[in-house]
Swiss-Prot record:
HAMAP family: RNA_methyltr_RlmN. [4Fe-4S] cluster binds at C116, C120, C123. This is Dual-specificity RNA methyltransferase RlmN. Belongs to the radical SAM superfamily. RlmN family. Its EC number is 2.1.1.192. It comes from Pseudomonas entomophila (strain L48). Keywords: 4Fe-4S, Cytoplasm, Disulfide bond, Iron, Iron-sulfur, Metal-binding, Methyltransferase, rRNA processing, S-adenosyl-L-methionine, Transferase, tRNA processing. Signal peptide: none annotated. S-adenosyl-L-methionine binds at G170, E171, S202, S224, L225, H226, N302.
Length: 379
């Protein structure tokens, strides 16, 4: 992609695209691999640092290309070790990237859009409205920046980032081409060399793009379900009105059937007090997913201002999990991480220059709802 400087940003190019770039400037294709290693293995953003690239070629690259990642605005570290970066992208909006360390892995949660157009009712990102898709460089740039922050050089040795989940701000499948390119770089040996089993794309259910996915890439798939029936899901996840559950699950199963091995669909389900956490919801979920090879990840709601929802009690969470277990499912409840720095699931907001004006409308409605009503003034 050409940036505002008129130069090609090499950060977001796949290996095939990098080879095409070197063809276009009259250079041999093996240079693509050399430059990719410098960018992604070593975090280099200066052609002068590429010591196995000749001076003449370095000067040529300097004239027509650049390596530009998103700008880090802030970095916060939680008491539990979770890190959150706020990064500014070309549109002027800010998005958030979260790193979650555990004993056996380090998971990076990556954003795909500045804001989100889907307006899921329990997600703070959706309340920010939508500005733009991130470029491939801005998506993979979050991995690049995080890797540089850890000082892991090269990226594939003693790596801090073992897993990447496309679960940050935005709906990845509504930024299809750029997300596909970024995930290819994540898995490319000359990029970050992350196993396809350790790269997960999460979707709220853009059925045509799920159907298209297998033609382009092989990664793990997670479905943001959040409701066991169409009536409730229409309210929580409005895209369900266009792509209802039967159609959605058939699409997911079609994609999963193309993958090798014993890989299963991950079901994400945010538990909302008295909304979708009752025994009847668990029973409906068991029936809905009976023939779907899957694992279920329960996510207790992480509150944000004026959300209108509450987190269920620990007893209600355990009850729901136990009911699903007894129904024969592999179920885990996600431990809340990074909530003290607003980095928990559903809390990512960034700073979005909202083209939909949804955030203005949302704030106005919530303020009206919070105002005390004068009963004497009512008819």
């Amino acid at each position: 992609m050409t940036t505002s400087t008129g130069k090609i940003n090499l950060l977001g190019l796949t290996l095939a695209e990098m080879e095409q770039f070197f063809d276009s400037i009259g250079e041999k294709r093996f240079r693509a691999g050399q430059v990719m290693k410098w960018i992604h293995h070593f975090g280099v953003d200066d052609f002068a640092a590429m010591t196995n690239v000749g001076k003449v070629l370095r000067e040529k690259l300097e004239a027509v290309a650049e390596i530009r990642g998103p700008e880090v605005v802030s970095e916060d570290i939680s008491a539990d070790g979770t890190r959150k970066w706020v990064v500014r992208v070309a549109s002027g909006s800010c998005v958030e990237t979260v790193y979650i360390p555990t004993d056996d892995r380090g998971t990076l949660c990556v954003s795909s859009q500045a804001g989100c157009a889907l307006d899921c009712s329990f997600c703070s990102t959706g309340k920010q409205g939508f500005n733009s898709n991130l470029t491939a460089a801005e998506v993979i740039g979050q991995v690049w920046l995080a890797n540089k922050s850890f000082g892991t050089v090269p990226a594939k040795i003693d790596r801090a980032i073992t897993n990447v989940v496309m679960m940050g701000m935005g709906e990845p499948l509504l930024n299809f081409d750029n997300v596909i390119a970024a995930m290819k770089i994540m898995m490319e040996d000359l990029g970050y060399g992350i196993s396809k089993r350790r790269v997960t794309l999460s979707t709220s259910g853009v059925v045509p793009m799920i159907d298209e996915l297998a033609k382009h890439i092989d990664v793990s798939l997670a479905l943001s379900l959040h409701a066991p029936n169409d009536e409730l899901r229409n309210k929580l996840v409005p895209i369900n009105k266009k792509y209802p559950l039967k159609m959605l699950l058939e699409s997911c199963m079609g994609y999963m059937s193309t993958l090798g091995g014993k890989r299963v669909l991950t079901i994400e389900y945010t538990l909302l007090k008295d909304v979708n956490d009752q025994p009847e919801h668990a029973a409906q979920m068991i029936e809905l997913l009976r023939d779907v090879p899957c694992k279920i990840n329960l996510i207790p709601f992480n509150p944000f201002p004026h959300s209108g929802y509450e987190r269920p009690s620990n007893n209600a969470i355990r009850r729901f999990q136990d009911l699903l277990h007894h129904g024969g499912f592999n179920v885990t409840t996600r431990t809340t991480r990074g909530d003290d720095i607003d980095a928990a699931c559903g809390q990512l907001v960034g700073q979005v220059n909202d083209r939909t004006r949804r955030s203005e409308r949302y704030i106005a409605v919530r303020q009206l709802a919070d105002e005390p009503q004068d009963s004497a003034a009512r008819p």
